[in-house]
Amino acid sequence: MMCMKALEALVSPQTLFYTSNEPFITEFGATLPELQVAYRMWGRLNADKSNVIVICHALTGSADADDWWEGMFGTGKAFDPSEYCIICSNVLGSCYGTTGPTSPNPATGNRYGADFPLITIRDMVRVQHRLLTALGIERIKLVVGASLGGMQVLEWGFLYPEMAQALMAMGASGRHSAWCIGQSEAQRQAIYADRHWNGGSYAPEQPPNHGLAAARMMAMCSYRSFENYQERFGRTMQQGRQGALFSIESYLHHQGRKLVERFDANTYVTLTKAMDMHDVARGRGEYEEVLRSMTLPIEVLSINSDILYPMEEQEELAELMPNASILYLDEPYGHDAFLIEVEKVNQMVNDFLNKLE
């Protein structure tokens, strides 16, 4: 059973923390009186501070990019600490050290829980910008990320085009589709249906784990593909805790149990709502015209088997943004291919970095 202390223990000992006592006003006007940002750094800044790479993580990720993208780090790899200063921060609203629903609310002394405000991808990027400014960084060579991370990459290009030299967005769209919003809402409803949910005001020692596990099981079905699951599991059976199970059932139960050991339900709700709010055109004009206004070089990575963010969405981005190019990851693993085909993704990022030299 996950509790808040257990979540704190999941923050790696290499994690650094930035604290800001300057109030943060969210896009929709809520005030966070103070911020804590958990982040990791690899490598060192060069003399003119021009070698910074910013990595943006996905929904249940953390600042530990060398863990979840391990094959991307090392000598000769895309994220080479001997060449670059690489920074990854835990997003606003998460539960791995950055201010979010599991953080103490200064007004009450208790954790925010359900009182944590609605946030957006833009809020996440603005917090990252505050961190980088505090670190004395004025220029970023590349902002790169996938899924929720890819959404952050796009917002970096619109919010701070003078700071980022180039962008690389993987498995993401310029705005969340009805299909994705529906997936998110179904997962949230699974959490809400848990008897321990209590409107989000659940006891830390008794969280809605059944609901969160069910949400994860649903999500895992959208992160992969028909071809991948059919090839990997088919209709094979195996013995499980509840007797004979299809192998796919056992796998999904395992994934659900794993997530509740490392994540928080309010955090899941907060971040999926932020993803649903994703729309680079909100408040900026017509969608197509906003994309045409993007001036930065951007490489868009499309995964051919991704059922969440299909190729048509990345092709639209590449067609409308004037300095965009598109790459295709032709693999059967679905949306999660960016985490599975790391060697190929590493080569793509490396090639793009070489073009920027």
UniProtKB/Swiss-Prot annotation:
Domain AB hydrolase-1: 51-340
The species this protein was found in: Chlorobium chlorochromatii (strain CaD3)
UniProt subunit comment: Homodimer.
MF terms in GO: homoserine O-acetyltransferase activity
Active site, UniProt feature: 147 (nucleophile), 306, 335
Metabolic or biological pathway: Amino-acid biosynthesis; L-methionine biosynthesis via de novo pathway; O-acetyl-L-homoserine from L-homoserine: step 1/1
One Gene Ontology biological process: homoserine metabolic process
Keywords: Acyltransferase, Amino-acid biosynthesis, Cytoplasm, Methionine biosynthesis, Transferase
Entry GO terms, CC: cytoplasm
Entry EC number(s): 2.3.1.31
Reaction equations catalysed: L-homoserine + acetyl-CoA = O-acetyl-L-homoserine + CoA
Primary location group: cytoplasm
Pfam families: Abhydrolase_1 (PF00561)
Positions with a binding annotation for substrate: 216, 336
Family under the similarity heading: Belongs to the AB hydrolase superfamily. MetX family.
SUPFAM superfamilies tied to this protein: alpha/beta-Hydrolases
Annotated localization: Cytoplasm
Protein name listed in UniProt: Homoserine O-acetyltransferase
Entry annotated with the keyword Acyltransferase: yes
Function: Transfers an acetyl group from acetyl-CoA to L-homoserine, forming acetyl-L-homoserine.
Keyword field contains Cytoplasm: yes
